[in-house]
Structure formats: C-alpha cells, structure tokens
Amino acid sequence: MGVTKKPDLNDPVLRAKLAKGMGHNYYGEPAWPNDLLYIFPVVILGTIACNGGLAVLEPSMIGEPADPFATPLEILPEWYFFPVFQILRTVPNKLLGVLLMVSVPAGLLTVPFLENVNKFQNPFRRPVATTVFLVGTLVALWLGIGATLPIEKSLTLGLFSIK
C-alpha cells in the first residue's frame, strides 16, 4: 500500500470542501486501483467460494421428486402469481378477469397525472400516491392469501361467511 498523507487542516481547499461536506475523500488512499483491483475481487471470489462450499457440504433438495402418477389435488401457480390467479379464479367472465388484470398497470400509470410528484418528496404529502400504494398492497395481500384457500373461503379468507 502507499503512504497515507495526513490531512492539513490549514489547507484552504480542504476547508472549502469540508464546509460543503465533501472533504472525506480528499486525502487518503485512492479507490482506484487499491479497492477496485485488489479488494473487490477477493470479496467476490470469497462469496462464490462460500456459496460453493455450502452447496457441496449441505445440498438441499429443490422440491419433491417428480412422480407422473401422483397428481396433486389442486394445482397452484408460483407465489407471485397468487393475486392474478385469484382474480381469474373468482371472476366468472374471462374477459372481465383480463380487463381487471390490465386495469392494475393502467391505474398505476394514471397516478403521476393525478398529483404533482415533483412538488413534494415526502410520501405523506402525496395522499393519492400513498393511498394507491397502501390499498394496492392490501388488496394484493388479500388476493394472494385467498388464492391458497379453497374457492368457498377465498374471498373472505374464512373470516366470515357470505350466504
């Protein structure tokens, strides 16, 4: 490594940078080539070696072995498709289900036009965007949990009954 230069606090350039909050990297070791050529590859190769070692020493199965003669009772999609699956499962008309799925990104595209986002950075000062996010998250969680239940309990999550 190189010789580390001590900061001179009487230096006017350093004082100006410190006043702006930019003086932390003015003196000391440079990031190039010390960090980028020597330290980062060691960290990356060490991470790969640790993952490879764990995979060799403690292999884990990725699901059950395939059995073509045993079909599951209910076939479910991957977890990230649960809300879409629930919409298609509960809506009786296929066209209406597809329109509901298309309305989600279409509704999200209208949010910037409903509210001036450049004006405020705090999410609590953007009530439309915050409300759309919170309601969308709750609906997605509700639909995702409901997709794992039988169709009779899927809309209410079994909390109450609809007759």
Swiss-Prot record:
Pfam families: Cytochrom_B_C (PF00032). It comes from the Eukaryota. GO terms for biological process: photosynthetic electron transport chain. Keywords: Chloroplast, Electron transport, Membrane, Photosynthesis, Plastid, Thylakoid, Transmembrane, Transmembrane helix, Transport. GO terms for cellular component: chloroplast thylakoid membrane. GO terms for molecular function: electron transporter, transferring electrons within cytochrome b6/f complex of photosystem II activity; electron transporter, transferring electrons within the cyclic electron transport pathway of photosynthesis activity; oxidoreductase activity. PROSITE patterns: CYTB_CTER. SUPFAM superfamilies: a domain/subunit of cytochrome bc1 complex (Ubiquinol-cytochrome c reductase) (SSF81648). The chain crosses the membrane at residues 36-56, 95-115, 131-151. It is found in: Plastid, Chloroplast thylakoid membrane. It is a multi-pass membrane protein. Component of the cytochrome b6-f complex, which mediates electron transfer between photosystem II (PSII) and photosystem I (PSI), cyclic electron flow around PSI, and state transitions. Belongs to the cytochrome b family. PetD subfamily. The 4 large subunits of the cytochrome b6-f complex are cytochrome b6, subunit IV (17 kDa polypeptide, petD), cytochrome f and the Rieske protein, while the 4 small subunits are petG, petL, petM and petN. The complex functions as a dimer. This is Cytochrome b6-f complex subunit 4.
